[in-house]
Amino acid sequence: MIQGSGSDVGKSLIVAGLCRAYRNRGLKVLPFKPQNMSNNAAVTPDGGEIGRAQAMQALACGAPLSVDMNPVLLKPQTGNGAQIVVQGKVVGTAAARDYQQWKPKLLGAVLDSFSKLAAKADLIVVEGAGSASEVNLRQNDIANMGFARAAGVPVILVGDIDRGGVIAQIVGTKSVIAPEDAAMIQGFIINKFRGDPTLFADGMAFIAQRSGWPALGLIPFCAEAALLPAEDSFGLSTARPKGRGKILIAVPILPGIANFDDLDPLRLEPDVEIAMVRSGEVLPAEARLVLLPGSKTTIADLAAFRREGWDIDLAAHVRRGGHVIGLCGGYQMLGRTLRDPAGVEGPSGEAAGLGLLDVETELTGDKTLAPAVGASAADGAPFKGYEMHLGRTFGPGCAAPLLILADGRREGAVSADGRVSGSYVHGLFSELAQRASLLARLGGEGSGLSYEASIERALDAVANHLESHMDLDHLLTLAS
């Protein structure tokens, strides 16, 4: 089990790399994360949902997605509450304080899912959540040491040297956790190192001496890792490939942003530059496309969009002849009205949309979770993605759909001038034909590069990187 000294230390990436490395050695490997908190989710073949990090890890294993890979998924909503997804299905919502009372009931589901995976694999690589040293959350924990001890899984602790203070991260963890928890840790890894590793040899020795845990690896930065999707929204604030092409795509970062990995295939295109627009910034006037991504809290995010003045920027963008695409929650925002009579996303209410599409949306408790296959209505460009949304969108604008699904249903909407469009389908731009069609409309051309192939190459590169800087044979002995 890979646990971290904090969030964003690289746990998800290390698990994915280990999964691919051991798969390349001929083992049947599966990923597992007892509890994840993310609005970036993937749809499983049976209509459940798991964190997208586990979907990437499953890809690294060459395994089909399963709800058992991430039995508890928390999807943050407005305020301090979250939607609770257990073994792929929504079971309720809870405030942060109330969730502590849920955890004892969820441990059974976590261990059940782990047992199912263990029966099918030679090796399971487990990812913890957040920090192993959050002693205030230790009671009834199911994400880190609570799970590790219940399942008898050895732990490797990862620290992040890039953010500074890594010695204190590891030694401090040892000093605050219970001795019984510390005994589960079989060694530590230092991640994201830059420079000459010999200069940190004394640091590694000091950590080992003070913690009593052996050093299992000093992992340098891996350039190819940046090509893999980020799971957490604060990964959007760090340096990621954005291109330097002639087509500028502006993406506003809203508080409830979800499934933002829809952007990753566009980063692959040399003609594209992506500008992630943060609070306090304006939508750039030179953008050819403004893309509104998914949202877990659509009405609240629409209010935030207006507070930033981005509605004014967007109206000016449209007057200049710019293009707009809304995906899922972004699609809902582009319509005339959003209604949430049952308070599905928060307090019940209604909000005026941005009025760029002649549609309206009513949020309901029924959640659509399904693969989506079809083609563009305009040019027949094929796509393969998935739907994950609450409510339904309807109105005159739906008579001019963006997509035609394989079963003949119309999906999405396009404005009369063709410059504004919206859809519930995630993963559209993973398809070469869809990216080429979009870029042609924006005055560019597609590169012909396969997004799927780039992900596979990146996973192999990360696996080889870990093979070079960790003793994977020793890790296997720990697992046995």
Swiss-Prot record:
Pathway: Cofactor biosynthesis; adenosylcobalamin biosynthesis. Keywords: Cobalamin biosynthesis, Glutamine amidotransferase. GO terms for biological process: cobalamin biosynthetic process. It comes from the Bacteria. Gene3D superfamilies: 3.40.50.880, P-loop containing nucleotide triphosphate hydrolases. Catalyzes amidations at positions B, D, E, and G on adenosylcobyrinic A,C-diamide. NH(2) groups are provided by glutamine, and one molecule of ATP is hydrogenolyzed for each amidation. Belongs to the CobB/CobQ family. CobQ subfamily. This is Cobyric acid synthase. It comes from Methylocella silvestris (strain DSM 15510 / CIP 108128 / LMG 27833 / NCIMB 13906 / BL2).
